[in-house]
């Protein structure tokens, strides 16, 4: 016993207790050894773990604790010194690792607590995101409903369809019990129930617009909850209902349509609104949500826009229908006017032909009588007859010109002519007449005025003759001056003619002709009437003046055709007057001789006057006119053969005849076709006779047709002996006669 190294236990031995401690230490050791294994397993399975060294220390601490318990199993009995040393070493190591782990946990535990805090924060954030996602889903659903409702509302532009569709779609989308629209009356003092969803209330019911609940809704941009008992919310019978559904009202702006007058639209001098009322189902706990109210507000704005578009479309359709009616009426009036113009032109053409035929006889025979031996009294009577006949012919020409000017059928005959020679010719024509009245007439032509010009020579002469003729006619004594010069651009504009906008292009100029006289003068207030057809002022319409009052009216229209302006100035009766006109003419690219244009001339002393033996063939269906024309030609020495039909003419015509006069406006006979057949009958131009149209109608169509079929000229009835002499002289000299009137 003395050699035994066993340590005597300090405590009394109790076998049972020892057994339990032994077993407990064994299982504690097993648990301590299994815990690190589990930690190592799960750490390896974890992809991210920031505290690996802590786990190593903690695992070492647990392993050492388990080792102490395991070693402690050998300490319950007698044990050796080695066991004691191992036990002591294990406890020392356990103490060191435990202290190190404890020190490490001082730094780790706050991080672990912050992880928990972050976890709570993330949970709160996730909950907030869930709420936001719910709001986004709600907004998306609201937007989808808005798009659907907007599409349905804008699928039509009929106002009634828009409003009915709005109520139906809102009722279906929001599951409403009732939905209604109150529209303002034309007076703006009441709201009228115009549309309802279920149509159980009579449409047409009105409420005053100044109710507090209506003012409350109209004063807000948002949907407002209103009492179910208010007059505008009593849309459904409430008998048997325990609790009516919530009601909201929203205003619908009626956009101001200042450019449109909608017949059944309220007067919008101030801003007006319609009222939309929406009711949730009764006897339910359902309430209005924010997104539903936003949907209602957006739909109200869309309805306002759609209603404005519908109103504009309705007015546009009304305007279109009105325009169509007006167009139909205008088209009918245009056709009637065209029919009237054609009838007038036909009447004038017939009257022109029928009047010129007897006038041709009067003038021709009177001119023939002038060639005979007459007593002074007889000559005076013949001259009076001839003068009156010429005046009547001029009147007929004026009426026809005015008619063609008014219907736009008269066109200018543009050509190159000698402007200086034209002015001298007018001066020479007027000078003998002025000399009889002891008037001194002078012509002043500016040095910078182009010698040749491009324009209608005949109409320009007609304008100047009319203006100068009036000056001679209404002047008893004194002077008449004619001044012609190029109008400067700064002097073209005239405040009396605000519609006259002179535009001078390249190779163009404005001719200004001014005729000043010391005659009777005119009241300034009467001047505008001078350019009205058939109008004469009191000082002008003197007993001896004569005239139809057409001259200046025709001149004004001719001047307008030439893109010009004409006006008259006078200080009053007895102070004379000044007539001025401006017309646009062209400048020819190179000087060239103007085409031959025969105008009425006084008997000339030069040229051929004896046509003895000249064989002439005359076609005229009118016996009197045929006999008169034959007498004129025979008096000039011509050998005349007369025919009354086209067949006879074609049978008789031959190379022996030098000139053929033919009326191209005979009934049931195409004179132009006869001219073509005459051309076909002869091989060359020198073999066939010269063909001249002798007619009472000399409009542009007739002249164009004469040129087309190859006629050498046109002569307008009536024809005097001097006119016929000039026609034959020029025809035989130049073998062409463009026109003689």
UniProtKB/Swiss-Prot annotation:
Reaction it catalyzes: ATP + protein L-histidine = ADP + protein N-phospho-L-histidine
Transmembrane residue ranges: 23-43, 53-73, 92-112
Molecular function as annotated in GO: ATP binding; ethylene binding; ethylene receptor activity; metal ion binding; phosphorelay sensor kinase activity
UniProt topology in membrane: Multi-pass membrane protein
Post-translational modification: Activation probably requires a transfer of a phosphate group between a His in the transmitter domain and an Asp of the receiver domain.
SUPFAM superfamilies, per database record: ATPase domain of HSP90 chaperone/DNA topoisomerase II/histidine kinase (SSF55874), CheY-like (SSF52172), GAF domain-like (SSF55781), Homodimeric domain of signal transducing histidine kinase (SSF47384)
Cofactor(s) needed for function: Cu cation
Localization in the cell: Endoplasmic reticulum membrane
GO cellular component, one term: endoplasmic reticulum membrane
Primary localisation category: endoplasmic reticulum
Binding site for Cu cation: 65, 69
Enzyme class, spelled out: transferase
E.C. code: 2.7.13.3
Modified residues (Phosphohistidine): 353
UniProt-listed GO biological process terms: negative regulation of ethylene-activated signaling pathway
Cofactor binding note from Swiss-Prot or TrEMBL: Binds 1 copper ion per dimer.
Ranges where the Response regulatory domain occurs: 615-732
Keywords from the named record: ATP-binding, Copper, Disulfide bond, Endoplasmic reticulum, Ethylene signaling pathway, Kinase, Membrane, Metal-binding, Nucleotide-binding, Phosphoprotein, Receptor, Transferase, Transmembrane, Transmembrane helix, Two-component regulatory system
Protein family: Belongs to the ethylene receptor family.
Subunit (UniProt): Homodimer; disulfide-linked.
Function: May act early in the ethylene signal transduction pathway, possibly as an ethylene receptor, or as a regulator of the pathway.
Stated name of the protein: Ethylene receptor 2
């Amino acid at each position: 016993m003395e050699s035994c190294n066993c340590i005597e236990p300090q405590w009394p031995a109790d076998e049972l207790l020892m057994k339990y401690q032994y077993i407990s230490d064994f299982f504690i050791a097993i648990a301590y050894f299994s815990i690190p294994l589990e930690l190592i397993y799960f750490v390896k399975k974890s992809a991210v773990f920031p505290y690996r060294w802590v786990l190593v220390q903690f695992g070492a601490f647990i392993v050492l604790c388990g080792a102490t318990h395991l070693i402690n199993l050998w300490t319950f009995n007698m044990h050796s010194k080695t066991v004691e040393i191992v036990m002591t070493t294990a406890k020392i190591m356990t103490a060191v690792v435990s202290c190190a782990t404890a020190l490490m946990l001082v730094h780790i535990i706050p991080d672990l607590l912050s992880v928990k805090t972050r976890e709570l924060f993330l949970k709160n954030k996730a909950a907030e995101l869930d709420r936001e996602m719910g709001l986004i889903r709600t907004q998306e659903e609201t937007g989808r409903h808005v798009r659907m409702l907007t599409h349905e509302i804008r699928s039509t532009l009929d106002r009634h369809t828009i409003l009915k569709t709005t109520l139906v779609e809102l009722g279906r989308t929001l599951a409403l019990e009732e939905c209604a629209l109150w529209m303002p009356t034309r007076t703006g003092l009441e709201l009228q129930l115009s549309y309802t969803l279920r149509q159980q209330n009579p449409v047409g019911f009105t409420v005053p617009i100044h109710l507090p609940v209506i003012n409350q809704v109209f004063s807000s941009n948002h949907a407002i909850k209103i009492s179910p008992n208010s007059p505008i919310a009593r849309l459904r019978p409430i008998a048997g209902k325990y609790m009516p559904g919530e009601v909201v009202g929203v205003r619908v702006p009626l956009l101001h349509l200042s450019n449109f007058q909608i017949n059944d639209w309220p007067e919008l001098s101030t801003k007006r609104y319609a009222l939309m009322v929406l009711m949730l189902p009764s006897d339910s706990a359902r309430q209005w949500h924010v997104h539903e109210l936003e949907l209602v507000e957006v739909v109200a704005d869309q309805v306002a826009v759609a209603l404005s578009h519908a109103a504009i479309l309705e007015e546009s359709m009304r305007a279109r229908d009105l325009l169509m009616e007006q167009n139909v009426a205008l088209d009918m009036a245009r056709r009637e006017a065209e029919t009237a113009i054609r009838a007038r032109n036909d009447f004038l053409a017939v009257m022109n032909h029928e009047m010129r035929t007897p006038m041709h006889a009067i003038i021709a025979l009177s001119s023939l009588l002038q060639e005979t031996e007459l007593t002074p009294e007889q000559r005076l009577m013949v001259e009076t007859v001839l003068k009156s006949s010429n005046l009547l012919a001029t009147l007929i020409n004026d009426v026809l010109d005015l008619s063609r000017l008014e219907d736009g059928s008269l066109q200018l005959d543009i050509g190159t002519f000698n402007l200086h020679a034209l002015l001298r010719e007018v001066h020479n024509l007027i000078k003998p007449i002025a000399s009889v009245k002891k008037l001194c007439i002078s012509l002043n032509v500016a040095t910078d005025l182009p010698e040749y010009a491009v324009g209608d020579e005949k109409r320009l002469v007609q304008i100047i003759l009319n203006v100068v003729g009036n000056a001679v006619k209404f002047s008893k004594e004194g002077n008449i001056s004619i001044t012609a010069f190029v109008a400067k651009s700064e002097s073209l504009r005239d405040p009396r003619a605000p519609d006259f906008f002179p535009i001078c292009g390249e190779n163009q100029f404005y001719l200004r002709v001014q005729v000043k006289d010391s005659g009777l003068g005119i009241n300034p207030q009467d001047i505008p009437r001078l350019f009205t057809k058939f109008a004469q002022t009191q000082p002008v319409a003197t007993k001896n003046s004569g005239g139809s009052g057409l001259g200046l009216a025709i001149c004004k229209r001719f001047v307008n055709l030439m893109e010009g302006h004409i006006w008259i100035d006078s200080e009053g009766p007895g102070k004379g007057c000044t007539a001025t006109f401006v017309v646009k003419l062209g400048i020819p690219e190179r000087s060239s001789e103007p085409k031959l244009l025969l105008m009425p001339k006084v008997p000339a002393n030069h040229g051929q006057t004896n046509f003895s033996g000249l064989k002439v063939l005359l076609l005229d269906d009118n016996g009197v006119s045929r006999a008169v024309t034959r007498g004129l030609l025979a008096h000039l020495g011509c050998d005349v053969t007369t025919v009354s039909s086209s067949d006879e003419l074609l049978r008789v015509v031959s190379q022996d005849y030098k000139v053929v006069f033919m009326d191209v406006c005979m009934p049931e006979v195409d004179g132009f076709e006869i001219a073509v057949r005459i051309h076909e009958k002869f091989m060359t131009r020198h073999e066939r006779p010269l063909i001249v149209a002798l007619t009472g109608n000399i409009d542009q169509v007739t002249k164009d047709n004469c040129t087309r079929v190859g006629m050498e000229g046109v002569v307008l009835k009536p024809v005097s002996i001097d006119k016929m002499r000039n026609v034959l002289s020029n025809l035989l000299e130049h073998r062409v006669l463009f026109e003689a009137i």
